[in-house]
Each structure stands twice: as C-alpha cells, then as structure tokens.
Regions:
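Membrane interfacial helix-start motif at the N-side
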Residues: 2-15, 78, 124, 192-204, ...
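Intramembrane alpha-helical segments
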Residues: 5-6, 42, 72-157, 161, ...
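The first (N-terminal) embedded transmembrane alpha-helix
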Residues: 9-26, 135-139, 263-267
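Helix-coil boundary and interhelical linker segments in multi-pass alpha-helical membrane proteins
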Residues: 22-42, 94-108, 143-164, 216-229, ...
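Membrane-embedded alpha-helices of multi-pass transport/permease systems
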Residues: 50-54, 58, 168-183, 187
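Extended hydrophobic alpha-helices typical of membrane-associated regions
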Residues: 212-215, 219-273
Length: 273
C-alpha cells in the first residue's frame, strides 16, 4: 500500500483539500453536514488520484529520460502500466461515486475535470502555456466544493473568484517548480516558461501571476467576506505569496511547504465569514 501512496503523492492532497473546502464553506450559509464533508473528501481524493496517475502514465517515457524523475515508480520498474491503470480505475470509482452521492448536478459536471487531467500532460509537448493546465486542473477544486453546496450556477461570482485565485496561484507555483527542469526541457524539446524565456524571466511571470492571485483574493474578500476577523488571514496569504517568490530558489520550501500553508490560510479566511 505504501508503494501506491508514494506513487500518487497522497501528501500533495494538502494543496487541493483546503481549497475544495474553501469552496464548500464559501457557498454554505450554515455549517455543512458531516455527510457532505465526507463525500467531498472522497471526491477530492479520487480526483487527485486520477490526476496524478494519468500524469505519471502519460509522462512515463519523459520521466525515464529525466535524471530528476527517472526513479519514479513507472520508469524505475517498480510499477507496471497495468497496475497504474488499476489505480486510475479505483480513483474513478471513488470520484464518480462521491460526485453522484453529493448531487446529480455534480455528477453531470464531474467529467469536466477529467478532460483537463488528460489534456494537460500533453500540453507541454506543444506550448509553454501548459503551466495554466496545472492551474486550471487545481482551480476545479474550490469550484467543485461550491457546486457541492449550491448544486447550481446561481450566484456563482464568489465561487468563480476563489477558482480564479487558485488558477493564478497554482500556475505561478508550477512555473517555480518547472525551473528545476529548464535544462532538460530544452534538450527534450518540451515547452515551459523557463525553457522558453529562461528561469529569471519565468520567475518574473510567476510573480505577476501571484500579484494577480492576491488581487483576486482581495476582491473576493470585499465582495463576499468583508469581515474584520478575516483580514489578518488575507494579509497573511499575501505575505506567504511574497515569501514563495522570495524563496523561489529553494523549490522544496516554496513549492511544498509554503504552498501547503497558503491553502489553509485561505480556508481560514473564508471560515471567518
């Protein structure tokens, strides 16, 4: 079992889980039921499993040629493609099953993120804008949480804003992460901002995306929260976004540690409403 958890990077759910619950509590007028919160957790876990596993399968040959990634389960031979396909199937059963239990509306919309999960890994073979595929995929988390409560498109502006924040934030941190592969991407003919513009210019783009992300969060605060108790968390999220850029040379710190905290800070801000 440890092999499978390591394969799908279960700890990376720390990025998406606070965001999907941010969507839930942003939409809720009262405390959601435990049942709904559990179904949302199952859906998020299933979606994360599908996304990570599809990415590993589609990129298996690229990972094999990259010294940074050639020890991953598939290129290293510790997991077969058929085993990985089985993981995708389990993730789909969990995801679609939970979406159905949440509402018929969520079940109807549930294939949309899967399309993004499939298309994104191929995008870097054609365009440097592939970073936005990561952001778009993760932005489905808070929007999914919103729909889990609302069950319709009515009054969707707050849900759209938290989704836009996630899109800009996640795209920005994916650019930071991709600086690790600047040299390999150039040699392999893969597209990314670092491989096209160089890491220095790519990090400027990442900074711009995070400025826009914080601006979106401010707009959400003014429109939907506007609570004095939430203000410190808004300010803290801005400080953390700044630190993520300031410490971008230390990808382990910026990508994994600071990012995990940002999601929970944004959730705390919404809980204060």
């Amino acid at each position: 079992m440890k092999k499978y958890f390591r394969f799908i990077k279960i700890e990376h759910t720390l990025f998406s889980l606070p965001l999907i619950y941010t969507g839930v509590f942003l939409a809720a007028e009262r405390v959601p039921s435990i049942e709904l919160l559990v179904f949302v957790l199952l859906a998020a876990t299933g979606a994360r499993t599908i996304a990570m596993t599809l990415n590993r399968i589609i990129d298996a040959e690229i990972d094999r040629r990259n010294l940074r990634t050639n020890n991953r389960e598939i290129p290293a031979g510790r997991m077969s493609l058929s085993e990985a396909a089985g993981v995708v199937l389990v993730g789909m059963l969990l995801y679609f099953g939970a979406a159905y239990l949440i509402s018929w509306f969520c079940f109807i919309l549930s294939p949309i993120p899967l399309i993004i999960f499939i298309v994104y890994p191929y995008a870097k073979r054609f365009t440097a804008l592939a970073h936005f595929g990561v952001g778009l995929g993760l932005s489905m988390a808070p929007l999914g949480g919103w729909f889990a409560v609302k069950g319709s498109l009515e009054n969707i502006l707050p849900g759209a804003l938290i989704s836009l924040f996630t899109l800009l934030w996640a795209t920005g941190f994916d650019v930071i992460y991709s600086t690790l592969d600047e040299k390999f991407d150039k040699e392999a003919g893969l597209f990314s901002f670092p491989s096209r513009f160089g890491s220095k210019k790519a990090l400027i783009i990442s900074s711009g995306l995070h400025v826009l992300a914080f601006g979106t969060l401010i707009l959400l605060f003014l429109i939907s929260i506007n609570n004095l108790w939430a203000l410190p968390f808004l300010l803290l999220s801005g400080i953390l976004l700044y630190l993520e850029q300031k410490k971008s040379a230390d990808v382990e710190l910026a990508f994994f540690k600071i990012n995990a905290v940002i999601g929970f800070v944004v959730l705390a801000m919404v809980l204060m409403k």
